[in-house]
Amino acid sequence: MKKIITLLLALVLPLCAPIYALAATPDESDFLSRYAQEPYVVTDCQMQVVVSEYNVLAVTETYQVYFNEARHGIYRYLPLRNQLTRTDGSTAVVTARVSHVDTGADECSHEVSNDKYVLRLGSEDETITGPHTYTIRYNYDLGLDTVKNADELY
């Protein structure tokens, strides 16, 4: 049975690798001046995760980004090797797989580097200034549960 889980960014630490930007509150009156020295800021981030019975997470991430200067886009790093410690003290290393990546109209290239799946969103030929919305959809496969009589999600 599938469950729809809407998770806050802070609760999904393995999926919330930094995208090299500062988080900011867009409704602050001095928002632009406060972060004007940064190349860009993430003004909002939302994630929706659908968990299948086979431990595959169908993830949709939406980022509102404000570019203070001309940039080609952003990077998104997804961890492929996850070390975890369970409540009983046992440890495990889980290797995840990323598939079915869709970034809509935004150009995207990817590579695997240092146990991370690296997404480069944006165009080498064009730059962006001002607000831009990125939506990234992908499957994050954690493999089958290895703990008997329990489901494991981290």
Place the predicted regions along the sequence by residue.
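Bacterial N-terminal signal peptides
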Residues: L8-P18
